[in-house]
Amino acid sequence: MVSEAPPFWWTKADWRAYALWPFSWVYGRIAGMRMDRARRATSAVPLICIGNFTVGGAGKTPTAIAIARAARARGLKPAFLSRGYGGSLDVTTVVDPEHHRARDVGDEPLLLAREALTVICRRRVDGARKLAAEGADIIIMDDGFQSARLVFDFALLVVDSGRGIGNGHLVPSGPVRAPIGNQLRHANALLKLGHGSAADPLVRRAARAGKPVYVAETVRTDAGSLDGVKVLAWAGIADPEKFFKTVRETGAVIEETRSFPDHHHFSEDEIADLIDRAASRGYTLVTTAKDMVRLEPGHGRAGELAAKSRVIEIEVRFDDPAAPGKIIDAALASARARRLRERKAG
């Protein structure tokens, strides 16, 4: 089981956040120095990093998919690089969605592999080499912005408009992964995702630092009406309330919800409880695509839960349809300039 982020991270800072501040100060110093001073390897092909400021989800994976689709539309061969968080494999692996399970490679890589070539690797440098050898001509890295292992040709940081950066404190006082100033210094642009004002102070700070700010929203893409349907909504993601809000926007009537930790692997008892609870009350089960890939058909009642659950499919849609192309063009230009510098230095 993957542990959950403390709820107090996402509310106004209280005594718990301030009690942990000395540890956050040390953590921030180390994280900031690592980002600024680490020696980074270069990728043989252009590399775009989709990251975020905080621990947990902000919409990185659907954003990465949107960029990949735009790259493919331009005739490029995009590929994804992921650490494979939540999976057990610790070797460089090309993800096969027909063969691998979430327990092997992680749930997000399985989603990415449905779109394009995907490699998981504990050492992202090795993963980038593998993707180049496999014929990718642009790499999209899902997360890993703070790891300071690779040179990014473009780094896009996603911030959720509803959550922002929580209480604004660094781990463990809050969800922020490294000092905001250090993160902005290594970012090329921000993506403000969704509706709400929680991200506005950060957006203004980024704009003052000269960083472009793109705007996008998540839109539902699955077919079929849920208007008036009584549902039991279940999700094991970083922000389940965001999913439940999406379900309500479909017109569904949420009678019950079940929340699990992000990347959670469901037990037989949990699966049985969801199935039996919905059946006894006549509710329709609804969940996310990320949760669905963690179910293992053929293992106990997991296949039954998968068959009885409706997936709310979403995608990221930029307000400016040209924005993904601008990001790709900037990454390609940066990579060309980087290679020219490398040749001159060599």
UniProtKB/Swiss-Prot annotation:
GO terms for cellular component: plasma membrane. GO terms for biological process: lipid A biosynthetic process; lipopolysaccharide core region biosynthetic process. The keyword Cell inner membrane does not apply. Keywords: ATP-binding, Kinase, Lipid A biosynthesis, Lipid biosynthesis, Lipid metabolism, Nucleotide-binding, Transferase. ATP binds at residues 54-61. Its EC number is 2.7.1.130. NCBIfam families: lpxK (TIGR00682). Belongs to the LpxK family. This is Tetraacyldisaccharide 4'-kinase. The gene is lpxK.
